UniProtKB/Swiss-Prot annotation:
Residues 1-19 form the signal peptide. This is Uncharacterized protein MJ1070. Keywords: Signal. It comes from Methanocaldococcus jannaschii (strain ATCC 43067 / DSM 2661 / JAL-1 / JCM 10045 / NBRC 100440) (Methanococcus jannaschii).
Length: 157
């Protein structure tokens, strides 16, 4: 029984543990550009998504551009920005911008100019690039295996 339970837990974590996590990027008036370099083994015929939570206090004349390998992947401006109290999630298809090997993610704040009482900033948080599961079996087969293990555990109890 314990053996089946351990296998079940391992299979549950297997499909959710692939990707690149960058945690937190903040651009501001004093630091308008942030660059992160990372390596990825790109798989053919697979869609890669860049997901993140974003918020900040930019106004109408300001925007934040997200570049991947020099290509503009996403722009945050007055039409889609979010305040610290109301954070937004975004998910971008970056398959065409991603290279096999070394990649550069750049976040650039444009016109982040404040004054004594106003200091503009923008934050990208929980930045994640998903990656395909590197298992010798298909995802459907993993689901079937989970169902069979659950059935075996149910029969034992």
């Amino acid at each position: 029984m314990r053996k089946y339970l351990i296998i079940l837990v391992l299979l549950l974590f297997l499909s959710s543990s692939f990707g690149y996590y960058f945690d937190y990027i903040k651009v501001s008036e004093s630091n308008p550009i942030k660059t992160i370099t990372f390596k990825i083994n790109k798989a053919e015929n697979y869609s890669y998504k860049l997901s993140f939570v974003h918020y900040g206090n930019i106004n109408k004349s300001m925007k934040v551009n997200i570049y991947l390998n020099g290509n503009l992947a996403y722009t945050i401006d007055d039409s889609n920005d979010a305040s610290p109290a109301y954070k937004k999630n975004a998910s971008i298809d970056i398959t065409n911008y991603l290279k096999d090997g070394e990649n550069v993610l750049k976040v650039e704040g444009m016109n982040l100019i404040g004054n004594e009482n106003y200091h503009p900033y923008y934050v990208l948080k929980d930045i994640y690039i998903n990656e395909p599961a590197k298992t010798p079996i298909d995802f459907k087969l993993m689901i079937y295996a989970l169902l069979i293990i659950c059935f075996l555990i149910y029969k034992k109890c």
